[in-house]
């Protein structure tokens, strides 16, 4: 049994063992754990799973139960998994376990808000020579820099107004000497245009998880991972009910009412 009250029941926010025990009773993931055999995955929401290429398992397919549903009777589809993945990676949610999804293509740069990288990587104007230097540069916050400088906040996190100031006075940001002046100006301009647009970085990424149809989930990884089904046993890979979460707040809101008794909608063997 549990020895104390849980601190919460949101699979994307809690991190304790006590909470995880309850969450596993309220929710079910793609696969389940065998009761007596380690390393053996049993069907969960997914009835079948397999790599597209057996010799290079960097892309997986999970076929979902067509009769899967939430405790309120709503259909549970691949879209609920996609919503759950995006929510876990949403920077504003500040989940402790977001890194569990870093295996998925483009999960890490989105979660870390690597704006400069995402804005520039597919730009034909960025030469291989530019990328040779840029890929080594971290445009995120620098806690060792003076708090009054743009370096402390990081280029990726500057507001439109701050980026305008940087365009006018390039010396407000200390660049690595390896980054040419032309590259610097281009990066600042791209960041400024995006900051003005008020768009979400999600629109820039080529996220590896997709849903070809309601009952199929495809996951493209950064590298081959033969034991991906085992990883999906962790509750951070569980689906969450999109309709219930958004009824009580936005995707990145913490500690909303959706996990309260009477509101929580799960897909596990128990209900709250």
Set out the residue ranges of the language-model regions.
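N-terminal lobe/hinge region of extracytoplasmic solute-binding protein
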Residues: 1-55, 265, 270
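Short, solvent-exposed loop/turn and secondary-structure capping segments
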Residues: 10-13, 74, 95-96, 229-234
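Second-shell loop/turn segments in exported
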Residues: 12-14, 63-75, 205-207, 258-260, ...
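Extracytoplasmic/secreted proteins, especially bacterial periplasmic and envelope-associated proteins
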Residues: 21-25, 40, 44, 76, ...
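Envelope-exposed proteins and targeting segments
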Residues: 26, 45, 56-60, 64, ...
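Gly/Pro-rich hinge or "lid" segments in bacterial periplasmic/extracellular proteins
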Residues: 34-36, 153, 160-207, 213-216, ...
